[in-house]
């Protein structure tokens, strides 16, 4: 195995870890909660719950007729394929590759939900008084943190390329 391939193994392990952690956490919630049941963890701030999201992040397009399930499925697969290719071609520095792997893992976790359940399982609910942040899951967290890392990588490399 070439050193280039073996050096990328850590990114595939990270993506796989994101998928496993996401699916395990969803299995635990699905096994323990009834739909819309809430258990307070931190008073007036954080609950565990079980809700279904047929749309995208923050229930975007959730009230549509069902076409969005396939749209987001295809979108997640296409973005993941692009990111896999980018990692393999060394189009990112290390921080960008970590971010890409996190996005791939998170997107894959939500794709698995769409294929198995027809919707994404969300269970983390943060709120303050009467303001509620939309429920989300571990996969969403990996996607968001991964996106931030990819953007930071892009900013750093833009500055580096201007120096040369």
Swiss-Prot record:
> Where are the bilayer-spanning segments?
11-31, 41-61, 64-84, 92-112, 132-152
Q: In which pathway does it act?
A: Protein modification; lipoprotein biosynthesis (signal peptide cleavage)
Q: Which GO terms describe its molecular function?
A: aspartic-type endopeptidase activity
Q: Which GO terms describe its biological process?
A: proteolysis
Enzyme Commission number(s): 3.4.23.36
Give the GO cellular component terms, alphabetically. plasma membrane
Disulphide connectivity of cysteines = none
InterPro entries named among the record's database cross-references: Peptidase_A8
- Task of the protein: This protein specifically catalyzes the removal of signal peptides from prolipoproteins.
Please name the NCBIfam families in this protein's record.
lspA
Q: What is this protein called?
A: Lipoprotein signal peptidase
* Organism of this sequence: Neisseria gonorrhoeae (strain ATCC 700825 / FA 1090)
* Upper lineage: Bacteria, Pseudomonadati, Pseudomonadota, Betaproteobacteria, Neisseriales
């Amino acid at each position: 195995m070439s050193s280039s391939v073996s050096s990328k193994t850590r990114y595939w392990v990270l993506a796989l870890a994101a998928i496993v952690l996401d699916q395990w956490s969803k299995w635990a919630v699905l096994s323990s909660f009834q739909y819309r049941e809430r258990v307070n963890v931190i008073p007036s701030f954080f609950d565990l719950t079980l809700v279904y999201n047929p749309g995208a992040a923050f229930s975007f397009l959730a009230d549509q007729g069902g076409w969005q399930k396939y749209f987001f499925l295809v979108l997640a697969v296409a973005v993941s394929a692009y990111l896999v290719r980018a990692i393999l071609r060394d189009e990112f520095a290390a921080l960008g590759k970590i971010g890409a792997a996190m996005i791939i893992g998170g997107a894959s976790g939500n794709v698995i939900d769409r294929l198995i359940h027809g919707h994404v399982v969300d269970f983390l609910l943060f709120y303050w008084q009467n303001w509620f942040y939309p429920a989300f899951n571990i996969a969403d967290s990996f996607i968001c943190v991964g996106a931030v890392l990819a953007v930071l990588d892009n900013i750093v490399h833009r500055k580096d390329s201007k120096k040369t």
